[in-house]
């Protein structure tokens, strides 16, 4: 399942990869927040079921998940990049997966910059020590477990962290699958400046700051 908002310039590759593994991916759900570009036509062209509603990643993921009553749900971002062999790695994870747990991937930026590797290591530390994977690492979760947790939190920002906290440390585990993601924001803002801003937002959220206020700051 993929939340989208004007992602026509990059979502095609991800949809093509998923649609190319029909024995593994039974259904693709795109939950759109009001795209004005060709996102929806691209999604439908790849056979995706489209859900529409107000923008906001938490709400979009929540609406999309409500369309899936059973089975495993793989939450992805529109800029996620699946590496060669991803289908086999996902199949191996599913073969031994516990429906009472959720699984996250290993972050990899689409950049050869050495600073990208440092930020990736910091993300790995966050997952190992805090068990707080971000949405750009993807999350594989069973529909029944997600429903038992009252679905994806309807937040403008930090819905991934809020869901991870609902799951708790014991119900989160890594999977042996690299998830590529765009480095555009880090290249624009500066690798360490962006990483520091993300850390500050995380700490503010954990301290109880309103996610809507954090989302406004995030867009600046």
Model regions and ranges:
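A conserved acidic beta->alpha catalytic loop
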Residues: 32-40, 80
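Short, acidic, metal-binding catalytic loop of nucleotide-sugar glycosyltransferases
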Residues: 16-25
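Acidic helix N-cap motif at the loop->helix transition within catalytic regions
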Residues: 9-13, 37-46
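Glycine-rich, basic loop-to-helix element that forms the pyrophosphate-binding segment
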Residues: 52-68
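Acidic donor-binding loop at a coil-to-helix junction in glycosyltransferase catalytic cores
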Residues: 157-163
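Hydrophobic helical membrane-anchoring modules
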Residues: 165-220
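Conserved donor NDP-sugar-binding/catalytic core segment of glycosyltransferases
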Residues: 84-115
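Short aromatic/hydrophobic "clamp" motif used to bind/position activated sugar donors
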Residues: 73
């Amino acid at each position: 399942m993929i939340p989208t908002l004007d992602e026509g310039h990059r979502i095609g590759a991800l949809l093509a990869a998923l649609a190319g593994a029909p024995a593994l991916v039974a259904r693709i759900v795109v939950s759109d927040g009001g795209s004005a570009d060709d996102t929806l036509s691209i999604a439908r062209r790849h056979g995706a079921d489209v859900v529409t509603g107000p923008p906001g990643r938490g709400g979009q993921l929540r609406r999309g998940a409500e369309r899936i009553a059973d089975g495993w749900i793989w939450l992805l971002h529109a800029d996620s990049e699946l590496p060669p062999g991803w289908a086999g790695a996902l199949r191996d994870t599913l073969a031994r997966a516990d429906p009472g747990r959720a699984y996250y991937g290993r972050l990899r930026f689409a950049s050869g910059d050495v600073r990208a590797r440092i930020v990736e290591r910091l993300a790995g530390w966050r997952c190992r020590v805090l068990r707080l994977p971000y949405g750009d690492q993807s999350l594989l979760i069973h529909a029944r477990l997600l429903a038992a947790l009252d679905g994806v939190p309807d937040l403008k920002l930090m819905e991934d962290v809020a869901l991870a906290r609902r799951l708790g440390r014991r119900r989160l585990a890594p999977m042996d699958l690299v998830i590529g993601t765009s480095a555009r924001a880090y290249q624009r803002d500066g690798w360490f400046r962006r990483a520091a801003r993300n850390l500050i937002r995380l700490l503010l959220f954990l301290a109880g700051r309103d996610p809507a206020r954090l989302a406004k700051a995030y867009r600046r």
